[in-house]
A protein has these predicted regions:
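N-terminal carbohydrate-binding accessory modules
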Residues: 1-40, 51, 66-67, 74, ...
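Short, well-ordered coil/turn segments that N-cap beta-strands
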Residues: 6-8, 35-37, 69-75, 137-142, ...
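The substrate-binding groove and active-site-proximal loops of carbohydrate-active enzymes
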Residues: 9-19, 44-59, 106-125, 147-154, ...
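Conserved, mostly hydrophobic/aromatic
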Residues: 12, 31, 39, 68, ...
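Carbohydrate-binding surfaces of carbohydrate-active enzymes
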Residues: 196, 200, 245, 254, ...
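Short, acidic/polar
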Residues: 19-33, 124-130, 253-263, 321-329
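Aromatic-lined substrate-binding rim segments of carbohydrate-active enzymes
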Residues: 26-32, 40-102, 235-242, 460
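Polysaccharide-binding and catalytic clefts of secreted carbohydrate-active enzymes
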Residues: 102-270, 274-291
Length: 669
């Protein structure tokens, strides 16, 4: 298995420019005790490197790079372009972004640039080039980190002009634009490209999450994602103009709504991301997001940031309990990471992140619980050498995640404000997670033939080519699982006429006549063929069978007796249509049928409360075994007699794992 790295990178964000040089040396001593081998530097240093328009000063950065190189660190080199220097804002105020309310921001904050500002792009490109020119040939520079956590939104004049250019390229004519956006509605016909304005609070926005014209707002999302991506590519290409084989990434943010990460991943050498769950985030949700980040390129990823213990920006910033950070890190490795990196290595003394966790706390020593846990994990990862690097996850289930659908579903007005895209995806992922069935998170244009089951929850927008791809998959023996609010609109958010689920109707063998929305306090029930019942709610499709077989039927309301779930034979395969949001037991009853029908297997034969994930190299299968429950769990019999790479001991019959306990077992192929 190929990988860019020679060892598991272990370290994180380091800002020695915030400290005196005597502390630098103390840091090197302490970091060595934690087995830290990498530092991400220069993330927010533009103001120091370029103190005025025509002046650069690399003296301090030279010292930092020399120090880390002498200590044999792998350097992740950031380009510093995520926060603008004051001189630029003072001289060129148009570089600052304009928010959804139409307010142009002043100097301050971060992620504060307009991506369509020619001034910003000129100086960002120049800075990336100069950094590469100076440091790219240093053998310790392992990876380039462009900007940081791309994520603002801008609605300024620069963006308005660029949006019009983007639209001209896409639609060619005003007539085509008017048809795509259905501009006869509310008399919104545009006569000239200059009539088009960004859909913010001053035009067709209805709050930041809703819109009068989803077609416009979805296109603006697409345009803005492309605009930010163009900035990333610009800096990447500036680096590669100096060093063509430079390894370049930027840190993504999981299920962040603003950017189409599948499109971004095609331009990145490796996906990296920042994992900051809250105290009550389900472990299945964390696992799903790791699998999504792995799925962006279908390759191992970098964990660019996590906190050693505490965050600072959530509502309740709980400490990670003893053993929790270690278990969380192994879960990250299990789902495809080749690096474990923290924000931050030394805790800041000021600013809004001064209470964000760090390897070195404000006490300034290694005599802390957090440091001891970091050091323990570092020693373990170091002992693995390169054995796990580049190993791959295997899956027979593909779960579709699509940013166009994310935007379209949540922009639409109705039928329920509680309908959230990521929640729906997670509901299905969680079933497979609890069964220890491997899942790939996949785009809509994936090769479906790799999977026995493809799950497409709330596939609201069926874009060109998707119908044919899904039909071919099912006809050739695959199982498709889809749900309510699927097959409703095309790629411009205009409804498919002829009845829901539109292009999926023949394959599903059902016609949805109406969609009922239930308030949180309202529930229905569905009855299965074996007489059991399950609660359901949120949305209830009123559907008619057109060749499909009912799996469950509603028990209550005027549509009692109508199907609540169905399956339809189509070619050699089957389409399952789930017409309502079942509670967990009911959903499991349906998905169990699909899994049994096609013979999808769990990682191990036993049912267990442990999370068990495998990665496979050319010569070894690695079993990551983790206990995230509150109870002791007995190790399944199929995992006994294997060597634990952490303890170097063989697993035994009846072995118990307490909460946060971890095993990494190896099986030679």
């Amino acid at each position: 298995m190929s990988t860019h790295f020679k060892r598991i990178l272990y370290g994180g964000d380091y800002n020695p420019n915030q400290w005196t040089k005597d502390i630098w040396q103390e840091d090197m001593r302490i970091f060595k005790d934690a087995h830290i081998n990498t530092a991400t530097i220069n993330v927010f240093s533009w103001a120091k490197i370029q103190p005025s328009e025509h002046e650069y000063n690399f003296d301090e950065l030279d010292e930092i790079v020399d120090m880390l190189s002498k200590e044999n660190y792998d350097i992740v080199f950031a380009t510093s372009t995520a926060a603008l220097p004051g001189w630029m804002v003072r001289k060129y105020p148009e570089v600052m972004f304009t928010d959804y309310e139409g307010r142009q921001h002043k100097f301050g904050g971060r992620h504060n640039a307009c991506p369509n500002s020619f001034v910003f792009k000129h100086y960002a490109r120049e800075l990336a080039y100069k950094l590469a020119e100076r440091y790219a040939d240093n053998p310790h520079v392992t990876c380039w980190h462009v900007s940081n956590e791309y994520g603002n939104e801008c609605f300024c004049e620069n963006c308005q002009k660029a949006f019009r250019v983007w639209l001209k390229d896409k639609y060619k004519t005003i007539d085509a634009l008017n048809r795509a956006w259905n501009m006869e509605f509310w008399g919104h016909t545009v006569y000239d490209w200059d009539d088009v304005v960004p859909p913010n609070a001053l035009s067709d926005g209805i709050g930041s999450e809703k819109t009068a014209f989803a077609g416009i707002s979805i296109d603006y999302r697409r345009f803005y994602s492309d605009s930010q991506l163009a900035c990333f590519k610009m800096e990447r290409d500036a680096i590669r103009s100096v060093k063509p084989d430079a390894f370049v990434t930027t840190n993504l943010m999981g299920t962040f709504k603003g950017l189409d990460y599948f499109k971004w991943a095609k331009e990145m050498d490796v996906v990296s991301w920042d994992n900051y769950p809250s105290y009550d985030t389900p472990w299945s949700s964390i696992a799903m997001t790791h699998d999504l980040m792995r799925g962006l390129k279908d390759e191992p990823f970098m964990l660019m940031e996590q906190t050693p213990s505490q965050q600072n920006w959530q509502k309740y910033n709980s400490l990670k309990r003893p053993g929790q950070m270690r278990a969380q890190s192994y879960q990250t490795l299990a789902h495809g990471a080749d690096t474990i990196q923290f924000f931050q290595l030394r805790r800041s003394v000021g600013g809004c992140e001064k209470f964000h966790g760090a390897v070195i706390a404000h006490a300034g020593s290694e005599n802390t619980r957090v440091f001891r846990e970091v050091a323990q994990l570092g020693a373990e990862l170091e002992s693995f050498g390169d054995r796990t690097l580049g190993s791959r996850n295997e899956a027979e289930v593909g779960l579709i995640f699509d940013w166009d659908n994310y935007w379209a579903l949540e922009y639409t007005s109705g039928p329920s404000e509680d309908l959230k895209y990521v929640d729906q995806i997670h509901q299905y992922y969680q079933y497979f997670y609890k069964k220890n069935i491997g899942v790939d998170m996949i785009p809509v244009d994936a090769d479906f033939s790799k999977y026995k089951i493809v799950v497409a929850p709330v596939l609201y927008m069926v874009k060109d080519g998707m119908k044919e791809a899904l039909e071919n998959f099912v006809k050739n023996g695959g199982i498709l699982i889809t749900t309510f609010m699927s097959g409703i609109v095309g790629q411009s958010d205009n409804v498919y006429l002829g009845g829901y689920p539109g292009p999926l109707r023949e394959m599903a063998g059902v016609w949805v006549e109406e969609i009922d929305a239930l308030a949180p306090e309202q529930k229905n029930k569905a009855k299965f063929a074996d007489g059991s019942t399950a609660a359901c709610g949120l949305l209830c499709d009123l559907m008619h069978l057109e060749g499909a077989k009912a799996l469950a039927s509603y028990e209550e309301d005027f549509y009692a007796g109508m199907p609540a779930a169905s399956k339809n034979t189509y070619g050699k395969g089957t389409t399952y249509y789930i017409a309502t949001q079942f509670e967990e037991e009911g959903l499991a009853k349906i998905l169990d049928q699909a899994v049994q029908e096609v013979g999808v297997s769990s990682v191990i034969p036993e049912e267990t409360g442990l999370e068990v994930v495998t990665r496979v190299s050319d010569i070894t299968r690695f079993y990551f075994v983790m206990n995230f429950t509150d109870e002791e769990q007995i190790l399944p019999e199929s995992l006994t007699g294997k060597k634990d790479m952490i303890s170097q001991k063989m697993t035994e019959h009846g072995m118990k794992l307490k909460k946060w306990d971890v095993l990494l077992l190896e099986e030679h192929l």
